[in-house]
Amino acid sequence: MQSPVINELIDAFKLLPTIGPKSAQRLAYFLLQNHQQDGHRLASAIESALEKVGYCQQCRNLSETEICGFCASKSRQTDQLCIVETPTDVVAIEQSGIYKGQYFVLMGHLSPIDGIGPDELGLPILRDRLAQGEIQELILATNPTVEGEATAHYIQQMAIEFNISVTRLAQGIPLGGELEYIDSGTLGQAFAGRKAV
């Protein structure tokens, strides 16, 4: 019979995405067997992050301050606003080094079935920001899913009210991809979005 405390630790690990029962059990026993100091460090880091990290009041990205570094930066373009679903989308875009504007993080996408509407995505905050008149281009970088497309359409309609240019990230064949391995939906998007050369 397994200890209730160990079971509680395993159940806690199962709360994490992509961690199933076996992985959770391996993680729990890994920490308890020979890595208790690492376990304390992990627990401390989690507790510290949960206490100190909140949301930027302007863009809703994760931040330790009321206004995050992206919004506070004087070197970023303030007339471009990239709309993303999650903070990890911001990380991915920043790693590309291509974009130097500001962000707005939805923390999800429209999903009426799950009770996620415009208010849950912070769209009233976005509307207020668009109404200020500084944003000239809104870049929609939501995921190419049904929900992501619906969310992008909703935001596009909002931007039209303020006469703001709206662009959408291109979709299609990845660089280095081979046609025979591309799914038909992606290939269809690539054909629909083709450009003159």
From Swiss-Prot:
A zinc finger (C4-type) spans 56-71. The gene is recR. NCBIfam families: recR (TIGR00615). HAMAP family: RecR (MF_00017). Belongs to the RecR family. May play a role in DNA repair. It seems to be involved in an RecBC-independent recombinational process of DNA repair. It may act with RecF and RecO. Residues 79-174 form the Toprim domain. GO terms for molecular function: DNA binding; zinc ion binding. CDD domains: TOPRIM_recR. This is Recombination protein RecR. PROSITE patterns: RECR, TOPRIM. It comes from Hydrogenovibrio crunogenus (strain DSM 25203 / XCL-2).
